[in-house]
């Protein structure tokens, strides 16, 4: 398990020594800021632009990264390469300026692949659960003293950052399938948590193209590498016969190489047993609720088992798991008298999930762990295309809460789509007949709705991938 790395692996690429200044367009994005941070720590001159200041841009600024707010031709001055987020339009002035100056413009995954080139890469992908699974693997490797470099899509709470430069050969990354760019990566180990209908517009509206992308990604493994996949997922089972690499399976399915059974949830903890081929069973206590997190944990256990990390370290890490920022994050109890002058308290949980399957998993975990609490959800839909593609799934799953407040769609740069807006979704849920949702048009209206609706013993769930977490935290947490 030796992980000693004696030199900077990027500088081991001779031509990369010619690259000194790297400019990121959309540097505040979760997929961008981690790569920028690692390169800054490796000694590169990093600059970046975004449309707003955020906690991530502030963090990078404190590391010495020059941040520009707004996109202008002059921002790319003297850059050797431009790294772009998938959310950036091709007509962005910085991209146009780079092309005119014949400066290379690359996707973030292409830069990530350069970071991985001389490292032992572990890439975690899948529609749901990849950020939490990445965090778990990072925690286990760190506890084992393997000092990995990591780049995650969310803040690893035990580390307080999205990314960290380690000095071993290990690089643990979240591999984003949303725009097909994960095919730039060539790791030694891959984890596929599941394959579901999301970002289909990026695959010409054809789910078969998304499945083909995962097949190609698995074949990016070298012949001596291996993949860890969840066979509870029917799409993964469908593509497995086409994969010509070593496969290790996990899941509640009895045929899995790592089989989960005896699952129990104890409020916000869970316990379960994992049987492993030719190895002792593990009795796991995980500091996170939900069957979905048991699956995430077992994927991490599979990686650690293959690496030869001791069971003692694995089990201790699961017991002490602190989680990931905004992934079923328990923010604690807040007094109602600071919100609406009533007596009592509410429990506040913040979750990034924005796909119907993720919402379903969160709702089930809450109903199991806190069955006597009224569930009040503040939901901010994310992307018009997602609402359009999964419209009826959203109607079904959102009808399973007690009180529902729906904010405007967080567009992530997309133009509006007729009938895929929050007002239309709200109307459709009301017509479905199980609950009567409220459309929230602004922060003042949200404050008033919370003042009017919250009562003692409620569980308030902040749900969505946009700005909703910061908005509700300001309204609730600042008053406590």
UniProtKB/Swiss-Prot annotation:
Q: Which reaction does it catalyse?
A: UDP-N-acetyl-alpha-D-muramate + L-alanine + ATP = UDP-N-acetyl-alpha-D-muramoyl-L-alanine + ADP + phosphate + H(+)
**What keywords tag this UniProt record?**
ATP-binding, Cell cycle, Cell division, Cell shape, Cell wall biogenesis/degradation, Cytoplasm, Ligase, Nucleotide-binding, Peptidoglycan synthesis
**A GO BP entry:** cell division
Which EC numbers characterise this protein's activity in its record? 6.3.2.8
Question: GO CC terms for this protein?
Answer: cytoplasm
Keyword Nucleotide-binding set for record: yes
Quote the protein name from its UniProt record: UDP-N-acetylmuramate--L-alanine ligase
Q: What is the lineage of its organism?
A: Bacteria, Pseudomonadati, Pseudomonadota, Gammaproteobacteria, Enterobacterales
Q: Which Pfam families match?
A: Mur_ligase (PF01225), Mur_ligase_C (PF02875), Mur_ligase_M (PF08245)
Matching InterPro entries:
Mur-like_cat_sf, Mur_ligase_C, Mur_ligase_C_dom_sf, Mur_ligase_cen, Mur_ligase_N, MurCDEF_pg_biosynth, UDP-N-AcMur_Ala_ligase_MurC
Pathway listed for it is: Cell wall biogenesis; peptidoglycan biosynthesis
Family statement drawn from the similarity comment of this UniProt entry: Belongs to the MurCDEF family.
Record-level Gene Ontology MF annotations: ATP binding; UDP-N-acetylmuramate-L-alanine ligase activity
Binding residues for ATP: 126-132
**Compartments in which it is found:** Cytoplasm
Which region is the signal sequence? none
Q: Which domain of life is it from?
A: Bacteria
Give the principal location in a single coarse category.
cytoplasm
Its annotated function is as follows: Cell wall formation.
């Amino acid at each position: 398990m030796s992980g000693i790395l004696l030199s900077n692996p990027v500088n081991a690429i001779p031509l990369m020594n010619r690259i000194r200044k790297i400019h990121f367009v959309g540097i505040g994005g979760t997929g961008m800021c981690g790569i920028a941070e690692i390169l800054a720590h490796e000694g590169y001159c990093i600059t970046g632009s975004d449309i707003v200041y955020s906690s991530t841009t502030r963090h990078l600024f404190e590391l010495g990264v020059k941040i520009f707010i707004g996109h202008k031709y002059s921002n790319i001055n003297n850059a050797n390469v431009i790294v772009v987020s998938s959310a950036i339009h091709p007509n962005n002035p910085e991209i146009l300026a780079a092309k005119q100056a014949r400066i290379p413009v690359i996707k973030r995954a292409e830069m990530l692949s350069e970071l991985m080139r001389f490292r032992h890469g572990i890439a975690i992908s899948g529609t749901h659960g990849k950020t939490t699974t990445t965090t778990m693997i990072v925690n286990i490797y760190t506890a084992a003293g393997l000092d990995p470099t990591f780049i995650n899509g969310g803040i690893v709470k035990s580390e307080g950052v999205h990314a960290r430069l380690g000095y071993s050969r290990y690089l643990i990354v979240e591999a984003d399938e949303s725009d097909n760019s994960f095919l730039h990566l060539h790791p030694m180990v891959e984890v596929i948590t599941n394959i579901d209908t999301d970002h289909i517009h990026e695959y010409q509206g054809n789910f078969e193209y998304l499945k083909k992308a995962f097949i190609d990604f698995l074949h990016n493994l070298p012949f001596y590498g291996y993949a860890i996949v969840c066979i509870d997922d029917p799409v993964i089972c469908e593509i497995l016969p086409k994969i010509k690499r070593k496969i290790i399976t996990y899941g509640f399915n009895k045929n899995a190489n790592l089989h989960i059974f005896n699952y129990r949830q104890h409020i916000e903890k869970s316990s379960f047993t994992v049987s492993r081929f030719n190895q002792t069973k593990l009795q796991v206590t995980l500091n996170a609720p939900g069957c979905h997190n048991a699956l995430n944990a077992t994927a991490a256990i599979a990686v650690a088992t293959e690496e030869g990390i001791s069971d003692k370290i694995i089990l201790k890490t699961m017991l002490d798991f602190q989680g990931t920022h905004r992934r079923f994050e328990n923010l604690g109890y807040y007094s109602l008298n600071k919100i609406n002058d009533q007596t009592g308290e509410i429990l506040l949980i913040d979750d990034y999930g924005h796909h119907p399957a993720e919402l379903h998993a969160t709702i089930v975990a809450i109903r199991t762990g806190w069955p006597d609490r009224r569930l009040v959800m503040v939901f901010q839909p994310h992307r018009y295309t997602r609402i359009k593609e999964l419209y009826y799934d959203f109607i079904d799953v959102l009808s399973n809460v007690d009180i529902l407040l729906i904010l405007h769609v967080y567009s992530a740069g997309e133009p509006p789509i007729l009938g895929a807006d929050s007002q239309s979704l709200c109307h459709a849920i009301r017509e479905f007949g199980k609950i009567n949702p409220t459309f929230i048009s602004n922060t003042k209206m949200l404050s008033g709705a919370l003042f009017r609706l919250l009562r003692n013993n409620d569980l308030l769930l902040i749900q969505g991938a946009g700005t909703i977490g910061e908005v509700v935290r300001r309204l609730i947490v600042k008053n406590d």
